[in-house]
Amino acid sequence: MATNQFANRTRQTLAWITTCGERVRSWYEDYRFGSIDENAQLGRRGEQAAAQLLRRKGLNVIAESESDRAGEIDLIALRKRPRLIVFVEVKTLSTTRPGHPADRVDENKQARITRAALRYLKRKKLLGITCRFDVVAVWWPRDEPRPTRVEHYESAFNAVGVDSFYG
């Protein structure tokens, strides 16, 4: 009888420790990589999930939703060694329609991102630094607290209208 009570008490203690461990891990990940605002619109939540992924990969997210008259860049990240600026377009899909979120980054969108990136580099006096254009695809079904899938495509496209980088 005493061993049965001991076994039950041990199971309860382990369950409590596991629950506490999950809470601590969740808190630490939010602290370390950024949290997701569950009240934000879908696109914004997708950008937050993408920023978490980039931080996990060792990139430093230096700007979010950077925009000017040339267009908007969802995320701008920096890799320190070797020095590289990464311009990231995030596409979030909430439905079960066929198709890939990244397919929505067509040539017109690429051109707008390229122009906005050039203006950003000129404005910050960073024209000599290597840059890359990435796409992050996020699948986030309706009524789900977290995305079901997040994929990062490095060097997803080259600068469109490259001569404008030097004009």
Swiss-Prot record:
Coiled coil, from the record: none
Alphabetized InterPro entries for the sequence: Restrct_endonuc-II-like (IPR011335), tRNA_endonuc-like_dom_sf (IPR011856), UPF0102_YraN-like (IPR003509)
Family, similarity comment: Belongs to the UPF0102 family.
Pfam short name (any one): UPF0102
UniProt GO MF annotations: nucleic acid binding
Highest taxon, organism lineage: Bacteria
Gene3D superfamilies: 3.40.1350.10
Protein's name according to its UniProt entry: UPF0102 protein RB9115
Organism: Rhodopirellula baltica (strain DSM 10527 / NCIMB 13988 / SH1)
NCBIfam families: YraN family protein
